[in-house]
C-alpha cells in the first residue's frame, strides 16, 4: 500500500470565507467515498489556497477489497416443490439475480428458511475505480453560491481553470466540465513562471513550494503567525491576532510575507477599539499593543502580502497611505459623534425600526426600562443600583445612530461606553452600556457589574419575548436573531451572579408589554414555549458543568423558570447519587407517585382521617413540608434531602397498615388526596422518578 492519489482543483480566486467549509466537505466526502468504494488507505490530507483545493491520499491499496452480497428470496417451501425442484418463484428470483437456480443457497432467518442469491464481488484495480469516485466527489460539493461559465455548462464557486489528477505518476482520466485532468498545475500568480508539471503525486507539495505556493494551509497559517510575532517582538509589542482574521488572511495568500508599518500617533486619540476595527475589517491588518500593557495600542501594524519581499518598502508605503485615509475617516466619525451627548441621540432611535410589528428601537428601549424596573423589584435592589441601571438601559441603544457604529456595527455598546464617559455619565452607567451586549459569543466574558448584568438580562429577555411573540423563533439550524445564544447568555449570567429569581415572571412581563395585535398566540402559550426554549439551554449548560442529564431533568422538570435554584439542587443531588438517603427518597416517591395519579388534587379533610397511621402520616407531612420549604428557601438542599429520606418510614407504614382503595369513596378520595399532596411535597425539590439507578 504505497500508492498516492493527488487531486487538485484549480480555480480563480475563491472567497476566503468559504474555503474552510470546502476543506471540511472535501475531507468528509472523500473519506466516506473511499469507504463506500472499499478502498483502503493510510491517511487523507486536504489542503487549500485561494486558487486551489487539493486532496492527497497516501497509502492507497492496489485494489478494492472484495465483498460478498446476499439477496434474500422467497421462503424455502415456496421456492422448491415436494420433489426439491425449483418452482417458478425460485427460477424468477434466480433470473433476476443473474445466477443459476441450482446456485441458490438456503439460509435461516428468524427461525425460517429462505433461498439466497450469494455473489462475490471481486475488487477492481484502484486506478480503474478512482476516476468514478472522484467524479462523484466533485458533484458532492454543497456550494453556498455558484458561478456559471462556458455558456452555463459548468458551475462552481469560482470558474475551474485546471485539474490535476494523478495516481502515483499516472494521469487519471477525469474532467470538470470542459477542463480535462492532466499533470499540469499552476504556481503563484505573480512569482512563478506559470504552468507547473507534477511528475509524481508524492512530490506535489515540494514542487509547488518551488513554484512559490505553500499548499498546506496549516503550514501557511503557522508561517504567518511566526512572521507577525517576529515583527511584533521588534517593537516590544503583542499582536492582536483574532482567529477569524488570521484564517481570512491565510486564505488570501499563497506565499505570505509579513511587513511592519506605522501610522501617526495623533490617531491614538481615537478609542483603540475603533482603530483596531478599522485596521482589521477594512485592511486585514494586525494591530500591535504594548507587550506590558495590552490596553495601550501602539502606532504600528502588520500587513501580510501575497508574495515575496521584493519591493517591500513600496508595498509598506502603499499600505500606510491607505490606512492613513481609513483612520482619518474614523477620526472624523469620532469627532462628529462626540459633538452631542448620547442622551440627545435617544430621539433618533424613533426613526430606527426594531421589528416591523413592534415599532422602533426607542419603543424597544421603553420596554427594556419597564422590564428593568420589574427585575429590580424582584431582586429587591435599591439605590444607587436602581437609578444607575435605569440610566444605563435608557442610553443602552443610543450609540446605534452614531457614525462610528453605522460604519462598524459590532462596535455597538463599546462606542456607547466611550461616548457616555466623555459626556460625564457615571462609570457604572458607562460600563453597563457596553456590558449589556455580553456575552457576544460562546466563551465570551460576562458582565462584571450589577448594572451591566440587569441591563444585559432585560435586553435579551425582550429580544427573545418579542421574537417569539410575533412568531420569529429558531427552527432547525436557522436562528437569524441569535436567540439561542442570547438564552445561553441569560443562563450563564444567572449562574455566574447566583441570581435566584423566576424567569417566568420576567418573561410574562415582557410579553404583556407587546401590543396584543402583534401576538401570534395567547400569552400563556407563548410563555410556555419560551420557558421550554430556555430550559433546553439550561440543560446544555448544566451538563457542560458536569451534571448528569437525568439529575438535571429531575430539577428542571419541577422548576424550569428558576435557573439558579434548579442548578443548585442538581449539583447537590449529584453528590447524593449513590447515597442511601437518595435511594430512600426515590423509593418513597415512586410508591406515592403511582397512586397520586388517581387523585383529584383536592384538600385533605382531617375529619375523614380515621386510622391512627394516616393521622400520623398527615401530621408528619405538614411538619416535614414546613421544614422542607424552609430548607429550600435557604438553599439547604442536603437538609431537604434528609427530611424527605426520613419521611420514607411513615409512607411505608401507611401503605402496610392502611387500605387506600376502600369502598367508601369519600375515604378513598381523601387518602388519595393526601398521597397527592405528599407527592407534590417531594416535587418541591425534584421529580425523583427521572433519576436513574
Swiss-Prot record:
Extent of the signal sequence: none
Keywords: Aminoacyl-tRNA synthetase, ATP-binding, Cytoplasm, Ligase, Nucleotide-binding, Protein biosynthesis
Reactions listed under catalytic activity: tRNA(Gly) + glycine + ATP = glycyl-tRNA(Gly) + AMP + diphosphate
Keyword Cytoplasm: yes
Annotated disulfide bonds: none
EC number: 6.1.1.14
Pfam family, one: tRNA_synt_2f
One of the GO biological process terms: arginyl-tRNA aminoacylation
Gene Ontology terms for molecular function: arginine-tRNA ligase activity; ATP binding; glycine-tRNA ligase activity
Compartment(s) where it occurs, according to its Swiss-Prot or TrEMBL record: Cytoplasm
Listed GO CC annotations: cytosol
Enzyme class, broadest EC rank: ligase
Similarity annotation: Belongs to the class-II aminoacyl-tRNA synthetase family.
Assembly with partners or alone: Tetramer of two alpha and two beta subunits.
Protein name as annotated: Glycine--tRNA ligase beta subunit
Amino acid at each position: 500500500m504505497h500508492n498516492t492519489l493527488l487531486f487538485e482543483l484549480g480555480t480563480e480566486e475563491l472567497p476566503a470565507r468559504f474555503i474552510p467549509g470546502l476543506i471540511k466537505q472535501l475531507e468528509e466526502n472523500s473519506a466516506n467515498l473511499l469507504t463506500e468504494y472499499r478502498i483502503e488507505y493510510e491517511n487523507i490530507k486536504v489542503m487549500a489556497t485561494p486558487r486551489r483545493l487539493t486532496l492527497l491520499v497516501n497509502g492507497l491499496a492496489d485494489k478494492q477489497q472484495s465483498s460478498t452480497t446476499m439477496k434474500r428470496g422467497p421462503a424455502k417451501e415456496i421456492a422448491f416443490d415436494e420433489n426439491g425442484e425449483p418452482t417458478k418463484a425460485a427460477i424468477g428470483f434466480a433470473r433476476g439475480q443473474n445466477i443459476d437456480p441450482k446456485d441458490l443457497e438456503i439460509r435461516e432467518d428468524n427461525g425460517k428458511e429462505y433461498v439466497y442469491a450469494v455473489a462475490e464481488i471481486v475488487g477492481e484495480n484502484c486506478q480503474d475505480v478512482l476516476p468514478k469516485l472522484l467524479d462523484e466527489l466533485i458533484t458532492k460539493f454543497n456550494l453556498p453560491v455558484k458561478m456559471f461559465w462556458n455558456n452555463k455548462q459548468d458551475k462552481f464557486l469560482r470558474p475551474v481553470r485546471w485539474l490535476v489528477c494523478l495516481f502515483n505518476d499516472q494521469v487519471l482520466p477525469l474532467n470538470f466540465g470542459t477542463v480535462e485532468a492532466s499533470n499540469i498545475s499552476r504556481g503563484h500568480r505573480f512569482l512563478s513562471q506559470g504552468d507547473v508539471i507534477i511528475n509524481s503525486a508524492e512530490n506535489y507539495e515540494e514542487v509547488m513550494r518551488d513554484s512559490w505556493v505553500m499548499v498546506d494551509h496549516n503550514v501557511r497559517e503557522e508561517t504567518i503567525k511566526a512572521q507577525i510575532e517576529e515583527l511584533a517582538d521588534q517593537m516590544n509589542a503583542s499582536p492582536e491576532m483574532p482567529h477569524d482574521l488570521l484564517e481570512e488572511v491565510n486564505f488570501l495568500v499563497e506565499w505570505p510575507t509579513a511587513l511592519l508599518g506605522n501610522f501617526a500617533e495623533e490617531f491614538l486619540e481615537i478609542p483603540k477599539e475603533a482603530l483596531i476595527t478599522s485596521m482589521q475589517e477594512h485592511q486585514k491588518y494586525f494591530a500591535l499593543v504594548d507587550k506590558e500593557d495590552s490596553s495601550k495600542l501602539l502606532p504600528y501594524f502588520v500587513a501580510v502580502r501575497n508574495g515575496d519581499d521584493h519591493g517591500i518598502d513600496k508595498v509598506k508605503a502603499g499600505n500606510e497611505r491607505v490606512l492613513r485615509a481609513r483612520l482619518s475617516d474614523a477620526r472624523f466619525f469620532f469627532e462628529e459623534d462626540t459633538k452631542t451627548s448620547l442622551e440627545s441621540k435617544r430621539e433618533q432611535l424613533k426613526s430606527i425600526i426594531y421589528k416591523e410589528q413592534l415599532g422602533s428601537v426607542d419603543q424597544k428601549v421603553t420596554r427594556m426600562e419597564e422590564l428593568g424596573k420589574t427585575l429590580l423589584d424582584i431582586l429587591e435592589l435599591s439605590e444607587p443600583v436602581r437609578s444607575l441601571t435605569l440610566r444605563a438601559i435608557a442610553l443602552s441603544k443610543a450609540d446605534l445612530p452614531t457614525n462610528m457604529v453605522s460604519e462598524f456595527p459590532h462596535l455597538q455598546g463599546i462606542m456607547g461606553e466611550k461616548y457616555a464617559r466623555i459626556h460625564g455619565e457615571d462609570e457604572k452607567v458607562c460600563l453597563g452600556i457596553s456590558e449589556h451586549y455580553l456575552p457576544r459569543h460562546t466563551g465570551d466574558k460576562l458582565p462584571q457589574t450589577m448594572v451591566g448584568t440587569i441591563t444585559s438580562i432585560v435586553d435579551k429577555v425582550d429580544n427573545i419575548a418579542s421574537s417569539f411573540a410575533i412568531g420569529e423563533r429558531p427552527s432547525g439550524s436557522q436562528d437569524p436573531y441569535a436567540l439561542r445564544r442570547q438564552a445561553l447568555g441569560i443562563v450563564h449570567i444567572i449562574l455566574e451572579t447566583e441570581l435566584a429569581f423566576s424567569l417566568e415572571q420576567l418573561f410574562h412581563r415582557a410579553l404583556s408589554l407587546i401590543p396584543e395585535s402583534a401576538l401570534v398566540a395567547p400569552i400563556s402559550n407563548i410563555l410556555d414555549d419560551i420557558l421550554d426554549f430556555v430550559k433546553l439551554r439550561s440543560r446544555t449548560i448544566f451538563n457542560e458543568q458536569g451534571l448528569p442529564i437525568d439529575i438535571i431533568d429531575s430539577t428542571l422538570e419541577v422548576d424550569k423558570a428558576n435557573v439558579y435554584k434548579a442548578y443548585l439542587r442538581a449539583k447537590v443531588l449529584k453528590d447524593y447519587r449513590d447515597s442511601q438517603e437518595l435511594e430512600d427518597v426515590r423509593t418513597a416517591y415512586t410508591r406515592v407517585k403511582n397512586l397520586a395519579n388517581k387523585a383529584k388534587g383536592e384538600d385533605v379533610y382531617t375529619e375523614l382521617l380515621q386510622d391512627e397511621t394516616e393521622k400520623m402520616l398527615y401530621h408528619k407531612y405538614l411538619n416535614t413540608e414546613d421544614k422542607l420549604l424552609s430548607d429550600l428557601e435557604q438553599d439547604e438542599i442536603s437538609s431537604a434531602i434528609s427530611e424527605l429520606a426520613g419521611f420514607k418510614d411513615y409512607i411505608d407504614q401507611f401503605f402496610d397498615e392502611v387500605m387506600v382503595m376502600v369502598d367508601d369513596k369519600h375515604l378513598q378520595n381523601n387518602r388519595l388526596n393526601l398521597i397527592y399532596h405528599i407527592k407534590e411535597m417531594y416535587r418541591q425539590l425534584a421529580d425523583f422518578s427521572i433519576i436513574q439507578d
